[in-house]
A protein has these predicted regions:
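Active-site core segments that coordinate phosphate-bearing ligands/cofactors
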Residues: 1-215
Length: 215
């Protein structure tokens, strides 16, 4: 059971043996990009968010907390609502798009910190999948903020892959998990190149934005 406000969930059951996992629920991730596209019409397609983010040198002091339906783990504040702060006359739509992508890294940082505290395990590499993992800017920024390697698999839908692996083990196609692990293939690797001072400054800005949402 988590002491840092994460969920305890059943990861899988194999041969009657249940393996549990820690789960961190983030309510809004890729949906923040969809909102910028459809709600504010800042760009025409989700992939354009990456080009916009890369068109500016930094976030310009802009932060987005995408708490459109409340804050999930590790805060659990359902009444919280979204925030875009740090806007100035110099702010462009590119800064807002970048802030939305950067928010995914900060939310992940909050969860990874809680998981490391709960488990006592040092996490040096994380693997990500889904739509946002196709965004190289987000993956690179995630690696920078976490100060960890980020791997993107060739099979981009890990949930479906995991279900297929369990089925394959169950019918004998794979001998066991060790056999299944040999079938996993990495498509991309992202490694941090951000300085400690820059990381600390950015993370402090996120913490201040979270405080605004929670106040």
């Amino acid at each position: 059971v988590s002491k840092n406000r994460l969920l305890t969930t059943c990861a899988y059951c194999l041969n009657g043996n249940i393996t549990y996992a820690l789960e961190g629920s983030v309510f809004i991730a890729g949906a923040a990009i969809q909102w910028l596209r459809d709600g504010l019409q800042l760009f025409g397609s989700a992939p354009e968010s990456e080009a916009l983010a890369l068109s500016v040198k930094d976030n310009g002091g802009v932060y987005m907390v995408p708490a459109f339906t409340g804050l999930g783990a590790p805060y659990w504040e359902p009444e919280a609502r979204g925030l875009i702060c740090g806007l100035g006359r110099e702010t462009e739509k590119a800064h807002i798009a970048r802030a939305a992508l950067e928010a995914q890294a900060y939310q992940t940082l909050d969860l990874i910190g809680a998981m490391c505290d709960d488990s006592g395990i040092a996490i040096d590499t994380i693997r990500i999948d889904g739509g946002l993992s196709r965004n190289d800017f987000m993956c690179s920024f995630l690696s920078d903020i976490l100060n960890r390697d980020v791997e993107v698999p060739k099979v981009n839908e890990a949930t479906a892959w995991g279900a297929a692996v369990l089925a394959a083990i169950g019918i004998g196609v794979f001998e066991d998990f060790e056999d299944a692990k040999t079938r996993w293939q990495r498509q991309k690797l992202f490694q941090s190149s951000m300085t400690v001072s820059e990381r600390d400054k950015l993370c402090q800005g996120w913490k201040e934005a979270i405080l605004k949402v929670r106040s």
